[in-house]
């Protein structure tokens, strides 16, 4: 057996502070993003809104002499394409493949539409569950597990209690429940479905690249009793694990960057809220096009004259300003990555679901997160974050991006029909029924089968109930 050295090229995902910031911005809605950027502009002296900078530059040009203007700090809007040496776009694994786009319309009025949204953590997970390739039995188990999660995303009940609640008999054992739980633990946000804090952190570490610095040691730390960390400190933990203090410090910093309450990432909007579209879709000369809405890309600028500001300060203040400058650059790059990723996803959805926009829900094709992730070369969790609480304005109105995804059922013609399309077909049949003799679920199933879409009666009943349509005996109307 010979020892040999091998070298290989590849990309690795390192959970740097700037990457964590980019992930955080990606999963925000436009309204949340505006609040986040406003706070950054308020706290970072090197950031400023573009319109304020342009106004200040105009005042300088009109009111100042050429000699005086050189003494004023100049400002520029940092172009999205500007790169920082210590943080490349490749590190995000979200690089855009071409030109971006924005639709800078006036969205202060009608564009901010008031819609009812009440997405909870359970809603978010159930949506992913229905898109997963699971059997009806496993989906039932999954729904029960999701219902048992607390607001932080943890499963506090033992699997044996879940099994008793299911009441599926001897056909299901605890191992089956555990298998479905592992599937849920792969959903977004990463870390949900954990039974302990250590398991929650381990799940988040598990999605990082194997070469992430400190990952293996961090997994070892979270596998033990976490309460020993503040008690022992880094030095004590290094002695206990027989590792260097530097290695342990690196691993501890990685652990601290994780989210101990992943369920909180999904807000519970129990009341009506204003929704600002993130993208705009329109048809031009027979071709569907997409662009970012103006408010989806907050226009933030950075002072060009920051070097003069730093030179005029003392050493301690100059160090502070350098740190603020680095944070400002990271923020601008995170905004660029968010916009590029969102636009790539929307344009990919357009390629698959143009029929949905032209003809409505009955033309919606089966489409999963995995398919889009595979085409774009991204992780499923990235796609999930990119579409979470995101909306697109279309000729059919403002639509949630998640509405472009649907599970599918095989048809007699060898293709697939999405669950959304089947629901639209059921609604159309019911709308056209004789009010004196409403169609039963069995009759609806027969009519769908005649149309080449074989579905069981119980499936029809499930879809009908999901649309809040009463059973046939309750729909009887006497003229």
UniProtKB/Swiss-Prot annotation:
Give the stretches traversing the membrane. none
A GO BP entry: DNA-templated transcription initiation
Instruction: Give GO terms: molecular function aspect only.
Output: DNA binding; DNA-binding transcription activator activity; nucleotidyltransferase activity; sigma factor activity
* Positions of short motif RPON box: 456-464
Q: Which Pfam families match?
A: Sigma54_AID (PF00309), Sigma54_CBD (PF04963), Sigma54_DBD (PF04552)
- Give the similarity note: Belongs to the sigma-54 factor family.
Role, per record = Sigma factors are initiation factors that promote the attachment of RNA polymerase to specific initiation sites and are then released. This sigma factor is responsible for the expression of the nitrogen utilization genes.
**Name the record gives this protein:** RNA polymerase sigma-54 factor
